[in-house]
Each structure stands twice: as C-alpha cells, then as structure tokens.
Design a protein with these regions (language model features):
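Short terminal alpha-helical segments
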Residues: 2-38, 42
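C-terminal amphipathic helix plus adjacent low-complexity
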Residues: 13, 79, 84, 88-91, ...
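Charged, low-complexity interaction regions
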Residues: 20-32, 46-52, 66-75, 90-99, ...
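Active-site and donor-binding regions of nucleotide-sugar-utilizing enzymes
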Residues: 64-67, 103, 174-348
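Conserved catalytic-core segment of nucleotide-activated headgroup transferases in glycan assembly
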Residues: 187, 191, 196-197, 340-435, ...
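Donor nucleotide-activated moiety binding/catalytic core segment of transferases
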Residues: 241-243, 424-470
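A donor-sugar binding/catalytic signature common to diverse glycosyltransferases
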Residues: 285, 449-493
Length: 567
C-alpha cells in the first residue's frame, strides 16, 4: 500500500470521527469524493463497470443516511468503507509482490537452467578453463548437485578442482587465505605458518561477520576477531566494508587460490562471504573448528557447503566413516588427517609463559587445583540442547569464590554463549552478561578467557567441568579428568556415543555432584576412569601414531602433492 493510498484511508476515517464528534456536519461530508475513492480501491481489473456500480450504490446509501439524520449509521458505514479500501489495497500489494516473486523465481529458474546446461556442456566438451571458473560461482556447481545425478556432480566437481590445481601449479605466487568468523575457532595456526614460511606463497587471514545473534554481538565479535589477529601479527583483512555496508568481493582482496574454511554454516555468512558466491576459481578446503560429537549429523556432514569443499580434513577415521554414512556424496572429498588443533599436544614444549592462572595471595600454589569451566551456549531451548549454564552459573561462581585457597579457575565460555544467554532471557542484555564475566575476573583465583587459543590452558590445567561439545574429545589429549554436565536433550553421533561411555558425568543441575567431582576426583586425585580414557584415545584419537606426523603437516603435504601431481 502506498503512502497516498494510506493517506486517503486515514482521511475517510477522520471524516467519520469528525461527524461523530459533531466537528463536521453530515451535509458537508464529501460523498462523491469518497465514492470515487472506493471505486479506485475496488478497481476490478476484469470488470471496471462492476466496481463503479458498487461504489455508486454505497454512495447512495450514505446520502440516504445523511438525509435521514442517521449519524451513527453514517459513521459506521464510512469506517467500513475505509477498512474495505485498506483490505483491497493490501491485497493488491500482496498480489503484486507475489506476482513479482513468481516472475523472479521463473527468471532465476531460467538462469539456473542456463548455468546448469553451460557447465555440463563445458564438462562434456572438455573445455573447462580458467576463464570459465573466474566467471562462475559455486552456485553453478551447486546446481549440478540439485539438477543432475550425484555421479555427474562428482565428475564435474573433480574437473573444476583439477582445472584449479593446474592453474595453481603454473603460478609463481600462490595466494592462500584462511576464512574465519571468530578467533575462538582458530585452529590452523600451524598450517598458516607452514605456508607463510614459503617465499612462493602470500598468506592472509580474512574475517567475515557471522549473522547469528544481535547486531551488537555480531559486530563486537567481528571487530574483536580482527583485533586478535592483527595484534598477533597475522596479515589480516576484514571482509565487511562498514562505509558501504557490504561484503567485499574476493577480487578486491586479491583473488586467493586456496581458502581454508573453519565453519560450515554457510547460511550465516552473507553476500560474497557465502561459499555459494565464491568464484569457482577458488579451491575450498574445510578443517573443522571443533571435534564433531553431537547428534546433528546433517549439520556436521551433509550441508550443501560440505559438498562444495575440494577436501575436508577430518578428525578421525570414525568421522570419515560418518561422512560416508550421512553425506549425500559420501566420503568422496573427505581425508582423515587428524585434528589440527591438537598438534601442539604432541610437541615437547616448555610450560606456557602466558599468565593464565590467578592464585589467591594466601593459597598454597603448589597444591592449588587448576580447573576449567567451559559452558556451552545452547541453554534452555537453544538448538543443540547441551547447555546447563542457566542452572548453576551463580553456584559455580560462588563455589570458585568460596574455594579461593584451594582452586584456580578459568571460565572459558563458548563464543556464542553471550548471544545465547541473552536470546534465552537469562540475561537481559549483553551488558548484563559482561557484568557476570566481570564478577569472575574480580575474584583473586579466577580469570575469563573468551577467545584465542586454548591449548596452553588445557596443558596447564588439572581438570575441566563442561558441557561444551567439542571439548569432550579435545580434552582427552591432555589425559586429565573432566566432568560432563548432562541433560535429557543430549544427542550424540556415532563417535560421540562411544566417547560418552568413558566420561565422568553428572546432571547439569546437580551442583552437589559437581562439588563431589572437584573434591574427590580432582583434589584427592581419585581418577578411576583414566584407563578407559586412555584405551579410547589409542583407538580413535592418536592420529600421530597412525599417520606418523602432525595433522598440520599431513594437510600441507597432501595439498602440495595434489598440486605437484597435475604438473
């Protein structure tokens, strides 16, 4: 409905109100103008005389009411006519939009069919070249999966990837980008260093906003992530142009040859930061930011993005088997490399120099137990259904406060807990959530570390209390006890179900069970499940023993070999 149409309707309603309040005489009511306005509102496309006849009849009815002094009936009729006009205008607007949407869908469908036919013809005629890949995006390849067979999709994907590999092999300079949304997900530092050490490579970290949560949360996270990488000396580019409110194109930042992805949830990236809008000339590699454990196997293995990655370097052989089982394209593009983030646990390094653990002045520092508290974001109705933070968050704070001489704590909240706790009403605002974190930071024996690497925190700790999902697998690399806080909504994938069998567990709302874990298992060193954890680790997680090298080197060498083979 246009402003002019809305103004016309409001004018008729005002006339009715003025007549009712005797601010306007009924005989001064502009009946002919109102009748004409109703005629235009009805405006039946296929029967103009009918709309004119109906409006004239209503006009005659109002004249009759005026002539007989029927003020209440006249006002009611004017209001009814205004409401009818509003309905007709809104119906027309809806139909016009629907018609426009259908027309756009038809045009998009025609264009999609053209793109599909074009890439299939290029493949069959063996004419896939660099120019074609520069001109098209991964939306075109996604159409092959949608409209063609899985086998055709695999064949054309392989052709696209081989064309890219040959181009990369010819280049003197290879451009490598790491695509991140949050420093807490950063797991590829060793891979970054391997490429950065090569004179024939240009390496950059690209940061994009991830549209989950409030605007404040989205852009606070985005700006903090850029600051994190910049301050640590990484070559860093923000993809969001705040002056024009848009996402920069990949050409603007130098057209990378290979992009490493850490997060597969492509629908939360907009514009050119969505993989569907990446040019086909980019070779996409996915290294999961966390260990896939919970039960959403579709989200973990069968999003459209999973099918558009050249290679997925997964955590374990079990995860490769799950890809075969749950993905539309099987394990076609999946390689079991081991989990890059865990490489540092295989290196003999001195104790971290970072000042992680705060100690109360009167604490016996030699005997203080260092405990990580890692709450997940999915409290209450949150999608994953793992979070228990809302049940015990104040009890955990008070317990840390009351045991200041015996314990030291790091609160490591999930990156999305800020958004999740506000969305679920636990805190009324981001500021209130931040005030809670400040309470922890003010304790003499606690510190909040929201982002950045956490391997050194794991190494220097004694135990963890958590419902954060990926940490359930990752903390096994330090061979220390952890308490998993459960709830009825917990679901696990194939790997997670086996993992859950060898964990200390307590109901997420049972604070007394949490205290017993700290006092008995941690302080008294009664870790009676150690052997079960070690057996699980050897069977599933010891990738260094299986591959004979760190995961970062395995990935680096795999990609290098693939490039060299096509020369």
């Amino acid at each position: 409905m246009t402003d002019e149409q809305n103004q016309m309707i409001m004018t008729i309603k005002r006339i009715a109100a003025m007549i009712e309040q005797e601010q306007l005489s009924m005989k001064d009511c502009p009946v002919s103008d109102i009748t004409e306005a109703l005629h235009y509102a009805l405006n039946y496309r296929d029967n103009a005389p009918l709309s004119e006849n109906i409006s004239l009849q209503y006009g005659d009815l109002i004249k009759y009411m005026i002539a007989n002094g029927q003020k209440a009936e006249c006002c009611y009729m004017l209001d009814m006519m205004a409401d009818w006009m509003q309905y007709e205008y809104e119906k027309d607007s809806y139909n016009d939009k629907k018609y426009s949407d259908i027309s756009k869908q038809l045009e998009d469908a025609k264009e999609d069919n053209r793109l599909f036919d074009n890439i299939v013809q290029r493949y069959k005629s063996h004419s896939m070249d660099d120019a074609f890949l520069d001109e098209h995006t991964y939306h075109t390849l996604a159409l092959v999966k949608e409209k063609g067979s899985i086998e055709l999709f695999k064949e054309i994907s392989s052709c696209v990837y081989d064309t890219n590999l040959r181009r990369i092999a010819r280049q003197n300079k290879k451009k490598i980008a790491f695509f991140v949304k949050d420093s807490a997900e950063w797991s590829c530092e060793e891979v970054y260093k391997l490429y950065a050490a090569r004179p024939d490579c240009e390496v950059v970290v690209t940061v994009a906003p991830f549209f989950v949560g409030t605007q404040q949360t989205i852009f606070d996270t985005y700006n903090k992530t850029i600051a994190y990488f910049t301050e640590r000396g990484f070559n860093t580019i923000g993809l969001y142009d705040q002056y024009q409110d848009r996402i920069k194109s990949w050409k603007e930042i130098g057209s990378p040859d290979i992009v490493f992805h850490l997060n597969p949830y492509y629908t939360a990236f907009i514009g050119t930061s969505s993989i569907l809008n990446f040019p086909l000339s980019i070779l996409n590699v996915y290294i999961p930011y966390g260990m896939m454990i919970y039960g959403n196997v579709s989200g973990q293995f069968n999003q459209l993005s999973h099918a558009l990655y050249w290679k997925i370097f997964c955590e374990t052989a079990c995860h490769k088997e799950m890809a075969e089982k749950y993905s539309d394209i099987g394990d076609f593009n999946v390689v079991s490399s081991g989990f890059v983030r865990m490489d540092s646990f295989y290196r003999d390094e001195p104790e971290p120099e970072r000042d992680i653990w705060k100690m109360a002045p009167d604490a016996d520092k030699q005997n203080v137990k260092r405990i990580i508290y890692a709450p997940h974001w999915s409290i209450r109705d949150g999608a994953a259904g793992f979070g228990n933070f809302d049940k015990t968050y104040m009890q955990m704070y008070n317990y840390a406060k009351d045991t200041a001489t015996a314990t030291s704590w790091v609160l490591r909240p999930h990156p999305m807990l800020r958004a999740g706790s506000v969305a679920q009403g636990l805190f009324q605002s981001e500021q209130e959530y931040d005030e809670y974190l400040d309470m922890w930071n003010r304790l003499p024996n606690a510190k909040v570390i929201e982002s950045g690497t956490y391997c050194d925190i794991f190494k220097s700790s004694d135990a963890m209390i958590l419902d954060s999902i990926s940490f359930l697998g990752e903390y096994l690399y330090v061979h220390k006890p952890m308490l998993f806080l459960t709830r009825e909504r917990n679901t696990f994938n194939d790997f997670g179900r086996e993992l859950a069998k060898i964990l200390y567990k307590a109901d997420g709302g049972d604070f007394n069970a949490i205290k017993r874990f700290v006092e008995n298992t941690v302080i008294q060193n009664d870790d009676y499940m150690l052997k079960e954890r070690e057996a699980f680790f050897e069977k599933y997680l010891d990738y260094y023993k299986i591959n004979g090298m760190p995961a970062s080197e395995y990935i680096y060498e795999y990609i290098d070999d693939a490039i060299n083979k096509v020369q």
